[in-house]
UniProtKB/Swiss-Prot annotation:
It comes from Homo sapiens (Human). Keywords: Adaptive immunity, Cell membrane, Disulfide bond, Immunity, Immunoglobulin domain, Membrane, Receptor, Signal, T cell receptor. Its main location: membrane. This is T cell receptor beta variable 7-6. Residues 1-21 form the signal peptide. One of its GO terms (cellular component) is plasma membrane. It is found in: Cell membrane. The keyword Signal applies.
């Protein structure tokens, strides 16, 4: 009988509960099989026009991914490759999508907003 190695990709958010005073992110945690697509959602503070996505791998500092001003993506230089994309179509809620997840995508994904 052969053995197979099943790799899981673990994605997570901190502070995902919406308190009315902060950014809301969902899902709170996401565990998926390698090769699956994942969409992470960020609902910024009401009235904030700028939105930022970051990721933080275990034992590492935060790494910038992308930045929006209203719905316009101003800087996507931190998106690691073409499997990562982000959108903010109406200048409010943003979605970060990771296609065909890989083990190296395991990290804490965070968003932040500002005026």
């Amino acid at each position: 009988m052969g053995t197979s190695l099943l790799c899981w990709v673990v994605l997570g958010f901190l502070g995902t509960d919406h308190t009315g005073a902060g950014v809301s992110q969902s899902p709170r945690y996401k565990v998926t099989k390698r090769g699956q697509d994942v969409a992470l959602r960020c609902d910024p503070i009401s009235g904030h026009v700028s939105l930022y996505w970051y990721r933080q791998a275990l034992g590492q500092g935060p790494e910038f991914l992308t930045y929006f001003n209203y719905e316009a993506q101003q800087d996507k230089s931190g998106l690691p490759n073409d499997r990562f994309s982000a959108e903010r179509p109406e200048g409010s809620i943003s979605t970060l999508t990771i296609q065909r997840t890989e083990q190296r995508d395991s990290a804490m994904y965070r968003c932040a907003s500002s005026l």
